[in-house]
Amino acid sequence: MEDIKSLIAGVDEVGKGCLFGPVFAAAVILSKENEIELLNQGLKDSKKLSHRQRHNLVPLIKTNSIAWTIGQASAREIDVIGIRDATEKAMLRALEKFSSPPDLILVDGILPIRLWPGKQKTQVRGESHFASIAAASVLAKETRDELIKRLARKYNCYGLEKNKGYGTEIHRTNLIKEGATKLHRKSFISRLEIN
């Protein structure tokens, strides 16, 4: 059993720039052996992986990690507290699900998690530098995409099954025609002159 003090979690978010739905974050703790196994299975920056590759990596990440967690912040929370605070809230929710806090967290990007009481390191393009951040990126993206795919059945005029909530032309056009749902980020779409 590894010493709990040696545990390092990679953290990443997805969905910050979307017009629809929550922002998701994942945190993943990997051993050196886990890292090697996942890298050999094709783990890398989620943006460089196809949907099928990411989808196939999810069970491998879950079974080849010491621990993994998911957190989210709703569209309403984003509207009330802003995207940066909501993103941090999603990350904190993921991190707080670990049975013991990691000794160090590796955060993708330049901004630290302000309310995290422990040690942290930020890294621009972190998913290209740390396997744990790459794994967190894959879990967050696939988990959010699955939710949006389910919601697309109910809110079918916005093209969500393809755009995953991002502001594509069909999404923006139908927001103007049909109006926003309760899952749209009102603070993000106010410039589109939507009711």
Curated annotation (Swiss-Prot):
Q: What is its EC number?
A: 3.1.26.4
Cofactor names: Mn(2+); Mg(2+)
One of its GO biological process terms is: DNA replication, removal of RNA primer
Q: List the catalytic activities from the record.
A: Endonucleolytic cleavage to 5'-phosphomonoester
What is one GO cellular-component annotation here?
ribonuclease H2 complex
The record's cofactor note says: Manganese or magnesium. Binds 1 divalent metal ion per monomer in the absence of substrate. May bind a second metal ion after substrate binding.
Keywords, in A-Z order:
Cytoplasm, Endonuclease, Hydrolase, Manganese, Metal-binding, Nuclease
A GO molecular-function annotation: RNA-DNA hybrid ribonuclease activity
Q: Where in the cell is it found?
A: Cytoplasm
User: Member of which family?
Assistant: Belongs to the RNase HII family.
Database matches in NCBIfam families: PRK00015.1-3 (NF000595), PRK13925.1 (NF010537)
Q: What is this protein called?
A: Ribonuclease HII
**The organism's lineage?**
Bacteria, Bacillati, Cyanobacteriota, Cyanophyceae, Synechococcales
Gene, per the UniProt record: rnhB
